[in-house]
Amino acid sequence: MNADKIRIFSRRRVLGWLAGALIAPEALAQITNHESRITPFASVVPGYRLQFPRDEGSHPEFRIEWWYITGWLNEATRPLGFQITFFRARPELKHANPSAFNPRQIMVAHAALSDPSHGRLIHAQRAARDGFALAGADAGRTRVWIDDWRLQQEENSYRARILAQEFSLELECAATQPPLL
């Protein structure tokens, strides 16, 4: 490199550091200033008594929650392990934005299949914001979805539908024990 390129690179680096130093205190203040939230998160409080099946659905006032199913499938040729998880996260909103594009809830789903014949875990994931009926989590009984991925509580079971590139799962799962808290 010649001296001009080194000088330009050094100036850019110094300017970047200066800009970061000037912006960092404001960014840190916004992150730590919980009073500026327009939509505060609900707190988990001791003594709350969960009521099932009502509490198996979404609680959108909380920051994060998830629905998780794991199990073994006894296929004729080999056993298969599976895992399905749907996450719901509520981002911190600093301003009232009536737009349907405003991400009030973020949905993330992950599914995996352990098939010994593949020699590795096969997995897929999806993410979307709620709205436009593309993703969501219902309050009350469990019903979470992203596009055509679904986990839904029926009367005495859960139905899961995962259509991924390398695998698909269509499951009906029944609880074998009461909820474990």
Residue ranges of model-derived segments:
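Generic cytosolic/nucleocytoplasmic N-terminal low-complexity/intrinsically disordered segments
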Residues: 1-4, 32-34
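N-terminal secretory signal peptides and thylakoid transit peptides that target proteins
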Residues: 2-20
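Targeting-peptide/extracellular-domain and disordered-appendage signature
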Residues: 16-17, 30-181
